[in-house]
């Protein structure tokens, strides 16, 4: 059981690392909001099930849509304002802080810093706790490996090249009648959807949602370390980066 739960953490952090790999390592956007996007998706999914009675499938779709829309909108806005580098980082960091303030300031709805238990959709289907953990572990494995292979397949292709050009030399794209804002937004949409999916899967696999799991310290910083250890822009390397980060977390926790 411990190893299965550990793999849930690995899948979560590695997926966020893959999001950073695409949006920062390739598209050149310094973003500090992956945890907030994952948290937005997880909270929207969990709260809509709790307060509105939506089914887990509908709630999850709504959660992913919320996180994806938020991430895409912020990057699109930053690009329209021609913000670059640390300016984008500041904007997205403010969004992360706003997310945390929203969660902590609306305890009647979000239960504040304490968080709340999430109803496991697999338990509703009759699966036991250990069986559900195995399913989530397999889902996490498929998510991380599938995303890594998908991004690897994109690398070197036209869209990948346009993502990189949009981040490194947007003026060059404009001279070729291509809109860099469009390609930054597409990269943001893909990355945000990955983060949102990871956030929801993590919430269901742990059975709990709390703001600490989606904070800058617990999510964004490890995600950047995962991406950096994989060699920014290398999706396969991020899988190994996730192993290193998880090992470091466990070793420091035991000290």
What positions do the PLM features span?
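Transmembrane alpha-helices and adjacent helix-loop boundaries
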Residues: 1-255
């Amino acid at each position: 059981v411990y190893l299965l739960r550990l793999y849930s953490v690995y899948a979560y952090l590695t997926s966020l690392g893959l999001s950073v790999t695409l949006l920062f390592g390739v598209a050149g956007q310094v973003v500090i909001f992956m945890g907030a996007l994952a948290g937005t998706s997880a909270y929207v999914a969990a709260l809509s099930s709790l307060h509105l009675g939506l089914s887990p499938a509908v709630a999850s779709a709504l959660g992913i849509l919320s996180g994806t829309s938020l991430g895409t909108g912020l990057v699109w806005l930053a690009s329209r304002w021609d913000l670059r580098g640390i300016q984008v980082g500041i904007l997205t960091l403010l969004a992360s802080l706003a997310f945390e303030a929203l969660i902590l300031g609306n305890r009647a709805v979000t239960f504040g810093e304490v968080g709340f238990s999430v109803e496991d959709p697999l338990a509703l289907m009759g699966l036991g706790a250990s069986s559900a953990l195995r399913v989530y572990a397999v889902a996490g494995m498929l998510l991380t490996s599938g995303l890594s292979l998908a991004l690897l397949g994109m690398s070197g292709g036209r869209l990948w090249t346009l993502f990189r050009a949009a981040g490194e030399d947007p003026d060059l794209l404009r001279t070729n009648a291509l809109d860099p804002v469009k390609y930054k937004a597409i990269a943001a949409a893909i990355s945000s959807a990955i983060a949102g999916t990871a956030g929801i899967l993590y919430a269901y696999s742990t059975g709990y949602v709390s703001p600490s799991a989606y904070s800058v310290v617990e999510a964004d910083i490890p995600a950047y370390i995962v991406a950096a250890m994989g060699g920014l822009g290398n999706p396969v390397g991020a899988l190994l980066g996730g192993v290193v980060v998880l090992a470091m977390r466990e070793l420091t926790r035991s000290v």
